[in-house]
């Protein structure tokens, strides 16, 4: 043995065999927490980005099949119904069979986990949410990928703490929140919104400390870097770059916010009604649940052919609306139609979120409001597109009750940084009116409903997790 080998052996003899594990698992070490937060953010970025690509692949493949092989064998409408029904069936089956907590957006589950009242079975949630979401969103249903990405990001955070055997409760909590922030940052290419979503919307559950906030920031940054490395650095929504509106028009944004505040409260209540209605239909019976979901998927396959504006998450619809190709009456009809389709899809328990559908609704009503104001007040030089962007943030703020997140989210998604003042006015107006009307934030409402109506599952899951 050489002298160098003896020195190396002597050094290694004093190093614990699981040195890395011990270093990272010491929850009291701030540096180790930040390292794990970077790992969580990176993994959440990959999961969120490839989830988006997977959904896009399924949608494109479905379209190609309709144009070629299947479309030439069966009538086009029948082929569209069958393909979308099959995709929806896959999503509903995976959820009901393997991970019921993966139904819906999943954000209430993460909030419940941060309060230690819901488990995180990441080994089930990650594959079910990923592949189930591919099926449900790929079928053309009005669902967003943002909620699922937040839940999968949180699941990644819990996975990392389990892999490194982290015992410290505060560290586990911080990394769970970090994963949620990373998931949203990757879903919207919006790191600031991802950070603020955890700090603002999850404020009842989030344990504020310097290390936890730093962990959330690092995770969001890493997730966004991964997203941009794969998808590029362009904004998620390509829209015109608007200038700040005239000061004499700002009162219109306050009025728009008030209208969204009223609608946000009504919309949240309608979501609960829709969920309860679907439960009354299928009564948690798997066959009824799958049949209902498949029929719903087939209907949206048909709508994809004839009224595509009423299908999908709505991100692609937003820039189309701001081109000015739709009349005010058509915008109102599309708004009403998408309210109905959003309630049907999200209320059914499909593995999909409601972020993107809400942004589309805000755009439709906001643009219709701006176009109407332009007709009624021609001397004010009103740009309807500015009201469309303000509407995106206002409906989010009214329903989620997170105005700062809504402002940052819209700005980052559209790159319209000059519109921060009208966004602030509209979002704050929406939140104030919603609070005055006594409405609950949507995710708190959904979590409360889950805890109330699903107590048996809540008691069983920790046993399954422990096993």
Curated annotation (Swiss-Prot):
CDD domains registered for this protein in UniProt: EriC
Q: Which residues cross the membrane?
A: 31-67, 75-98, 122-139, 146-164, 213-230, 251-279, 286-307, 328-347, 353-374, 420-436
Q: Which Pfam families match?
A: Voltage_CLC
Its ancestry begins with: Bacteria, Pseudomonadati, Pseudomonadota, Gammaproteobacteria, Vibrionales
Functional description taken from the UniProt entry: Proton-coupled chloride transporter. Functions as antiport system and exchanges two chloride ions for 1 proton. Probably acts as an electrical shunt for an outwardly-directed proton pump that is linked to amino acid decarboxylation, as part of the extreme acid resistance (XAR) response.
Q: Specify the protein name.
A: H(+)/Cl(-) exchange transporter ClcA
Recorded catalytic reaction(s): these are: 2 chloride(in) + H(+)(out) = 2 chloride(out) + H(+)(in)
Answer yes or no on keyword Nucleotide-binding: no
A Gene Ontology MF term for this entry? Answer: voltage-gated chloride channel activity
Q: How does it sit in the membrane?
A: Multi-pass membrane protein
Q: Motif Selectivity filter part_2 in this chain: where?
A: 144-148
